[in-house]
Every structure is written in C-alpha cells, then in structure tokens.
Amino acid sequence: MMLRTFTLLLLCIWLNRGMTSMAAVESQPELWIESNYPQAPWENITLWCKSPSRVSSKFLLLKDNTQMTWIHPPYKTFQVSFFIGALTESNTGLYRCCYWNEKGWSKPSKILELEAPGQLPKPIFWIQAETPPFPGCNVNILCHGWLQDLVFMLFKEGYTEPIDYQVPTGTMAIFSIDNLAPENEGIYICRTHIQMLPTLWSEPSNPLKLVVAGLYPKPTLTAHPGPILAPGESLSLRCQGPIYGMTFALMRLEDLKKPYYYKKPIKNEAYFYFQALKTQDTGHYLCFYYDGSYRGSLLSDILKIWVTDTFPKTWLLVQPSPVIQMGQNVSLRCGGLMDGVGLALHKKGEEKPLQFLDATSNTGNNSFFLKNVTYRDAGIYSCHYYLTWKTSIKMATYNTVELIVVAWPSSVFKVGKTITLQCRVSHPVLEFSLEWEETTTFQKFSVDGDFIITNIEGQGTGTYSCSYRIESHANIWSHRSEPLKLVGPAVTGFLPWNSILNEAIRVSLTVQFLSLLLLVLWLQWKCRRLRLREAWLLGTAQGVAMLVILIALLCCGLCNGALTEEIEIIMPTPKPELWAETNFPQAPWKNVTLWCRSPSGSTKEFVLLKDGTGWIATRPASEQVRAAFPLGALTQSHTGSYHCHSWEEMAVSEPSEALELVGTDILPKPVISASLPIRGQELQIRCKGWLEGLGFALYKMGEQEPVQQLGAVGREAFFTIQRMEDKEEGNYSCRTHTEKQPFKWSEPSAPLELVIKELYPKPFFKTWASPVVTPGSRVTFNCSTSREHMSFILYKDGNEIASSDPVWGNPGTSTAHFLIISVGIGDGGNYSCRYYDFSIWSEPSDPVELIVTEFYPKPTLLAQPGPVVLPGKNVTLRCQGIFQGMRFALLQEGAHAPLQFQSASGTSVDFLLHTVGAEDFGNYSCVYYETTMSNRGSYLSTPLMIWVTDTFPRPWLSAEPSSVVTMGQNVTLWCQGPVHGVGYILHKEGEATSMQLWDSTSNEGAFPIINISGASIGRYSCCYHPDWMSPIKIQPSNTLELIVTGLLPKPSLLVQPGPMVVPGENMTFQCQGELPDSTFVLLKEGTQQPIEQQRPSGYRADFWMPVVRDQDSGVYSCVYYLDSAPLVASNHSNSLEIWVTDKPPKPSLSAWPSTVFKLGKDITLQCRGPLPGVEFVLEHDGEEAPQQFSEDGDFVIGNMEGKGIGNYSCSYRLQAYPDIWSEPSDSLELVGAAGPVAQECTVGNIVRSTLIVVVVVALGIVLAIEWKKWPRLRTRGSETDGRDQTIVLEECNQDGEPGTATNSPSSALQGVSVEQTVPI
C-alpha cells in the first residue's frame, strides 16, 4: 500500500548518493503559473516552463500524460510560456513540461494540478536536510505554491493555528527548523492563499511525517529470492527490527521526494512485495521503523536491487601472463559492474564451475587462484556471475582467457637432456618464431609452436622468447612474448641435518669396515710367511680385527636407529557415516530412508549391504558426497544389520558402523563409545542413535534407573562424568527413545567397560606448521615424551592409523614424526597420539584439529565496533558463515595455530579479543568446518586488518581518469586506505557539506562526479568516517586539485633538445600561453596527477626534467589557468610524444602503388617513423653503400635492366643526434611482372636449352668412348701376322625376343655362335 506522505529521516540520505542524485534533480525543469489577475488568477493563466541548467530549442507541455502542445522558439532559450487563458472545466487536469536536450526529452517537471475555477492549486511539500544526521541538526521544509506573491502557512498536527507563515517573492517558501529536537516530530502540511483574499485557501498539501532518526537500533533489510531479478519477476523485501509493534517504512534513494512504502508489522518485521518488477525499480533501498510518537530508528544498510534481463558482461585477466610456466601459480582476476554477487570460474569442457567467490567478497575486483599449475590446468577459462536463487536473467561473458602452460618437463636443464618450449596464442597463426637472447643469429621457426631445445655440453641454457605472424599480415610479426629463462641444474635447497649426519655415518662406517677387512686379508697372507712359533700372535691379531668389525657393524645399526625418521602416514579410504531419516517421528518404522555420507571428496558411488544377504543397492554420490537408500515401511524382511561402503576410483572404504534394524515398534540399537578414562579428569561417553530428534538415556550395570538422561539433541548425545574415580568404573550402556510420550525405546547398546588404569603422562603433540591447511599441503605431526625407548601410536578420530617403533640408540627423549605428504579433503579430523612400553600406556595427548580448507564457500569476518581500536580496549570479531551447526576457528597471520575455536548452533560466532595491545595488530581471518566429516572446511575469509592505534592511518585521494578533465566529462574521486569496513567522507575546500560513502566493504571509496561543471572545480580531500563512536584521531588525505579545461585558448608545447633523448640526459618542456599571470600545469598521458605546476612571471613556463629515464617516455601536454580564476584551465596544448632511448624505434616501409613492377612504371617506397626532424636512408640488399637519402621518407625506384628488383629496408637518424641510427625496418621485396606470352616463351626457352645441353653432353660421351676404342683396334690389326681377324658377334641372338620365330640365321642355329669375317 502506498501512503501519500513524505518522510524526513535526518540522515542526509541524498548526500550519500553524491552528485548522482544531484544531477538527476538538476535535469528536471520547473513549471509555474503567472496571471495578470492577482485576485482571480483563474481568469487568465499562463504556464511557464524553465530549463534548469542549459538552453533548449524545444519545450513540451503535457496534460494527463498526453501531449498537449509544444513550442519551437526561433532561438534557444532557458524558458518559454504556454498560454492557457481562462480556466474552465476543459482546462482542469494534471500538467507537466519537458525540454529537449542532446539525449532527447528531459524528465518531466513536478505535477501541477489545475482544479475548478475559484480554487488555488495544491502546493507541493518536501524536505531538505544539509546537516549531520543527529538531533540538533537544521532542517528546511520547502513548500511550492505554483503562483508568485502567495502567503504560505505551515500547520502541524495537533495545533489549530499555523506554527509559521511566509510571504516570499517567488513561488516557494522555505520553513527552517533549527536544532531539531524530539518535540519537532509529527505530521506537517502547508497551505497557500492570495494576499488580497485571505479567505481563498488552496487545498492542503500532502502530509509530511517528520521522524527523528537514531533513537532505536537499525533494522536489517533482506531480499527474497535475491537482489538481482529479471523484469516481470516478483520480489519480497523483508525489514526486521528488534522491537515489536513498530511501523516499518521502505525508501528508495533514487526517489527520496516520492511517497514511501509503509507496512504494519507482523511481530517485529514487515514484508514489502513487488509483484511484477520493472527496470525502473532498480535502485538502492533502505528501511527504518518508528513508534506512535514518530521516534525513528537508524537506517538499515543500503540494499542494491538490480532489475535487468541481461547481466552486465564480465571480464577476465590473467596474472602474471596467460602463458605460464609449469609449477608456478596463476591468478585469474574476474571483474564486472555488479558487486555483491557471487562469481564462478568455468573451464571449457568442464560441466561444473572450478571455483566460487561468494557475494560478500565480490567488490568488483576479484581473483581466482590456481596453484602449482600443470598441463591439466591449460585451457580456455571464463567467469560468470553465480546466483544462489533461480532467475531468468541471461549471463554474458565479455572475454575468455586461454591459459598456456609452457616449458616441458621443466625450465631446469639437465646436461644431455632436451626441453620442449611451447609458444601458444588463442587464435590461428601462420608461423611461430623462437629467439635466443644470448645469440643474435639464433632463430627457429615452427608451425605448431613447439621448439625442442637440447643441452649438449650445457649450451642450451639462456633466455628465450617467441613471436608469431598471421596469414592476413604475413610480413608483420607480433611483439615478443615474456622471456623464459632456462637454467642448468643447481642446488634448490638444503638437506636436513639428520640426512647429512646419517649419510656421513654410513660412509664412515663403510670405510672402516673395508679397512679392517683388508687388514684381515693382509694378516692371512703374512701367515704363510711366518714361522710356527709366531702363529699365536697372528691368531690374536685376527681375533682383534674381527671384534672391531663386529663393533663397527653394531655401531652402524645403533647410529642409524638414533636418528629420528619421518613415518609416512598411509591414509585408508575414509570410513563413511550411515544414518536413518523418517517423516514419522513417533513411528519412524512407517517410512525409513538410509543415508550414507563420505568425508572424501573423490567418492564416486555408495553401496549399501545387509548382513546375511549381501549387496542391496548402489547409488552415485551427490554434490554433498552422500546418497539415499529408501526402504519404505519396515517389515520383517528389513530386519538385520546394515552398513555401507564408499567407492573411489582405485579403492573401497572400510564399512561404516553397523546400523541394526530390529523390527517394527523398536528403534535401531545405538552405539556407545568413550575416550580413555583417566583418574581425576572429566570423561565424555558418546551415544550415537542413528535418527534425528531422539531422547537418550545412559545406564550402568547393576542400577535399574538411568544414570543420566538427555532430551532431543540430534543423532548423538554426550554424557559427562565430571570426575573419574574408582566408583565410576563399571559397564555402561545407552538407549534411545522417541521424543514424545508414550516413548518407543531402542534395544540397549553393547556394553562399554570403563576401567581406570595406571598411565604415563600424556605426550607433547603438535604440527610443525599450522593445522589449517589447503589440499595438497605437506603436514608433519610431532609426538614426543621425555621417557626413553617408547613406541608411539597416531590416532585420527579415535582410530589408529600409524605407529612408530622404539629407538634404542638415542638416550633421552623419544620422538616420532608422522608425515602426510599430500593432504586430501578427507584427511582432516581430530588427531592425537599415545606412547607405551611393554605394559604401560600413556594418557592421550591433547588433540590437534587438522582442518582441510577450500571445500565450502568462505565466510566473512567483521570487527565490532570497528577494525581500529585503542590500546587496552576490547574488540569482537564476528565470523559469519553460510551453514548452521559448524565449528569456527580464528587465525592470525604469523601465528602457528588458531587463536580460538567456537562451535555454533547458528551461522555465526563472535571471537573476543580482550584488552588488545601492540601484539594484536595484524591480519585476521576465520574458517568454519564440519566436525562430523573429517573437518572439511571453508575457504579462509578475506583477511581483516586490526589496527591497535590512537590515530587512523592517512588515506590517499586520487582521480580517475585524471584530475585534469574537460567540461561535461565524468570523473570519479577514489579515497583509498588500508583500513577495511570503514566509510569515507569527501570534503571540498570552501564548502560546509561533505559527500559520504557509508559501510565501505573494500579498502577504497568511490565518489562519482557526473557532468563536470564550474561548480565542481576546487580542492578536495577525504578522510575515514567510521560508523561507530570512537575517540581515535582521524587524519585527512592529501589535497587533490580538480582542474577543468576547455575554457581558455590552448597553449603551445615545445621540448628541448628534441622528442628523443638518451637516458641520463636532461630535457626541458616549454609551455607558452597567451595570457599573463597564469599557472602552468604539465600533464602526462596515463597518469592521474599533474607532473608539475609552475607560476612564472611571464607567458611561458619551463619544466626542467633532469636525468630522464625510460619510464619518462610518453605523451605530454600542458594547460594553464589564470590567478583570477584558479583551476579553470585552458584547452590542452598539442601533444608531444617523448622517447627516452638510445636506440630509436624502427620505422615502417611500404610501397606505392604496389610491390610489383609494371612495364615502364616506377615504384615509390615510403619510409615512415614516429619522430619528427629526421633523415631517412634506403638500403638495397646486395649493395654495400646506402642507395638513397631523403628527409620526407619517399624514394622513387625504377626498374631499368631489372636492377630495381630485390629486398629493401630503411632506417633514420635524428638531425640532433646524427650518430644514432634507428633499427632497420622490416624488409620489403620488390618483384618484376611479365605478361602471359612472355612467361610462356621464357619457360619454352628454358626447356629447349636444357634439351640441347643434354644432347650435346650425350654426344660428347659417345665420341669419347669411340675415340678410346680406335687406337686399341689399330694395334690389334698390326699383330695379326697376315691372318684374317674376325669379330665374334656374341649378341646376334639378342636381336629378337627369345622363343620367337625369325628368319635370321641365328634363330635356325638355336643359340650356336656364328662367326663372320670382317676385314679391318
């Protein structure tokens, strides 16, 4: 229900919203009435509409939400008039006006209601508060009457006469209430009348409730189902206070002048419903309550409600780089526009999110952490908003990040081994290149990005980087990647002293043993050479030598045993828990479901078994690592003993404790257990009953009545024996029963015998590091006693898991070290140890709670009253979790163990730090964990710094994007400090009011200033503003000057000696203005603060920068402002890019019109660099001297006789530094072009020439062979002695194919040789 009243809560609400709400008010036009009939204004009415801050070209008048008329004046103006004339029945209605700006029509003005003739319009009534939010501040009540020269009357409920009146010259009266007090509370209205007609009154304004806030504690405001919903969905806002019978009110900060929602309470709370949300319902809501005397509470915390159909996009950044070396840690930083919303990290290919950040830790800038990354962590990651309620809002992701893990198998070389360097990007590339910084000539190319580096003779070590090029720009290479250093093997740590000593003893004893053995052999060899009378001496020597050898061996064993060795704990698969649930508490056997839960996060399935019948069912593990086995109504077939197992990938757990179902009308038999009874100490007896909501009774054998009884306390109960003495010994059992009478009882448990035995004192037991660990950590337990030669047993949750044998060679204390190499999620729990000798055991040690974190979402940690405390005072740290029934631990950075433990029935606990001192200063965090399932814990809360001091640390004020901005631009002032959870306040020099940011949940406060105007110029500072009463001193921040540019002619900026300077030299910026008596400001792009300011006597300021460095490179400009108008500055000067380097950047080289020569055409090569005043030179491959010089960088290349073809590059030098040349540009190749006919002729000529060469070479070979034969034949002819020589034709049968018919003589002879005489 909407009550048509307004309420003042003196908390300066709209000041909290800063300039945002102010800008919104300024953009609303003003509407009023003028008439030339002062005694009867309805006879002739003109409506005026005025723009608040700018001229406009169009104005629009609306009546009853429909367009009535619009005016387009011939020139832009601030205000226009709409003539109405005499007021008649047709003219009555609701009027508003708008004006046109660059974004469209403005917001409508306030509604003017014209009623019947003879009546004045009803005035508008609202509040303005400009003072601090406590009784005693000043309040202005504003009444707007629409007409000028009216009499304004202020009335208060309970008074017949007006309490105040005014006759202003305008249309509005301001009634001031100074020093607000409780008697000023109540309901106010205002009325107007014409001065000449005191009997003609207007209608009363809407009533206004004046509530003095801060007299009651603030309520809490929550949203259901959540604070972020889609349009059309329903929302319920619940306001809850500590006091019954109050009236509750809901306000929206964006509409403070609109009526508020109010509700009568339901006990001490009220619900505000929104059936179908709209996007304009987005805003900041708060609530309060008040009594019948209008005494109000403090405002609740502001609750931001988002109504949107699409989430704003999130972005994801990787630190230090998306290409990460294996084994390192990586941070994935996720951010978005929404704060107070959970975030989830997703990996492509994975169904479930990898990590979560809860809503309380999301401040718009958060990080997920991947530790000790491997190649399994490589992939494409994205982050999304994570909601715990259902909604139809679409999720959007701005970007994804591909994480690349490089250097396989590591970045440490072993001589003779190889390492694969992997260069990766998230898009297709043409080719990768690998550079080695130690060798300039080294370069490798790869298509897939894998480079194999060998380390022969240790020569592969060094620093490598890679780059790539894409197909569309094949001549352009990317920037180099971050360098990766490959190093040789080195000592990465120190061996433990025990290991060094152990190894030294082994080597020493081995040398002694070998020496003595050689001595015995030498004596035996001598035996053969000695006389018999010396044999007894030899025997004695041999005996002594053997005795020494035996003693050495014995010492070896004793020395090795004297060293304390670490005993690795082989953790068994955790035992699951089995219990029963029912929806019939008085008759649970009517419907029973068995549940099995495992503490191990890697459990895949659960198996339920029944004794005598074996396997019953298998169920997959849920997200809570549990499974349900419904049995239904119990029958005789269900009776028996049940237990369950959990299955992992390679192991099956031990069976759970047996749950015995006896039958109908009888509850399952409970299980009883207790710790070791120790004389004179307290003893707790545990009775586990399998069902929720049961009563428990403890019995002692020989007594009929229960020894102790407990009501419904869950599935288990603990009976306490305050002091264990001899009379308490005996056999105990326990039973369970239903909560309500008539009781249904269980069978008695198995008996438990309690006997007090003689015991040694308990050992000293601790962990070497903190017992709060992350999965994968290394944990060592140290158990020791002052007694000698003791054996040790390590227990987890009362079960033995490891043991240590006695050490005989070490006098003094006995110690055992138990080691968990890599802690799993199921390894948490309560650990203890005992020691024993042959017959006597020790008392159990004090338990150590090993908490394995990162299983549940992290809690939040807050300090009350605040994180800054005076020495000697108390502070309460509240740890707020998510789940009920958890146990909480408080940790301090640098402390070995948690400071405090507490168990909670709700979701939060309070840790008290009493009388804090300097030693309590530091970072605190908390964690919660469940004690029933291996101490599975949450992530650690965000650290909270506790300051023990009498003075707040000084914050720092900065501007984003810069403190020098143009008129109309938006700027955000950031107040940053190390103290968390404290509000900030922003001061402007010369103004009494301040902008406040309440309940900051981060360590920085944002103060946005929208649409910078002349009123925004000034000097600002900020300080902390704690929301608790504290005597701690507050220091102001630095002073920031907000300068607005664009109001004076721009100056000129020069630099001497030039835009490029060698590191270590000096440079001077000269800023020349046009007006005298000016202050000059030097600016650098990318920095938020000015570099330097000067007030010279003339028109120019010289900014001297001595010994410049590389980081001084950048883009500079300057502005100036007059002393008569400080901080109202000129336009920016021209920008100057400064290079501080001894090697100018390389230029670019391009060809026009193309890189292909055409017949008779030239090509112009264009060399361009980033610096002015340079000389360019063009180089052609193959020519020693540069070819051409040019000041403008243009080179004309001709192709006479094909001399223009080839690779070109260019470089330049500054005229101020003629000896310093830049790097050469990337090479550019010019090629020639031939027509199709010429190309075909060329190819034909090449083919023909090749054939001619082959033929000529073949003929030459044949002629050479024949030439060699000729002298040999001639010599044989001279040696025939007159006989005819014959040439045997042995190849005659080879003229035809074998086996074919032929007419040759050879075929008839069938292979017989035929000789034919040939004259030579």
Curated annotation (Swiss-Prot):
UniProt topological domain (Cytoplasmic) ranges: 526-534
Function: Seems to be a coreceptor in inhibin signaling, but seems not to be a high-affinity inhibin receptor. Antagonizes activin A signaling in the presence or absence of inhibin B. Necessary to mediate a specific antagonistic effect of inhibin B on activin-stimulated transcription.
GO molecular function term, any single one: activin receptor antagonist activity
Matches recorded under Gene3D superfamilies: Immunoglobulins
UniProt keyword ATP-binding present: no
Taxonomic lineage: Eukaryota, Metazoa, Chordata, Craniata, Vertebrata
Protein name: Immunoglobulin superfamily member 1
One Pfam family, short name: Ig_3
Top-rank taxon, per record: Eukaryota
GO cellular component terms listed in the entry, alphabetical order: extracellular region; membrane
Domain Ig-like C2-type: 29-113, 115-212, 224-308, 312-399, 401-482, 572-665, 662-756, 761-853, 857-942, 949-1044, 1049-1134, 1145-1226
Signal peptide: 1-18
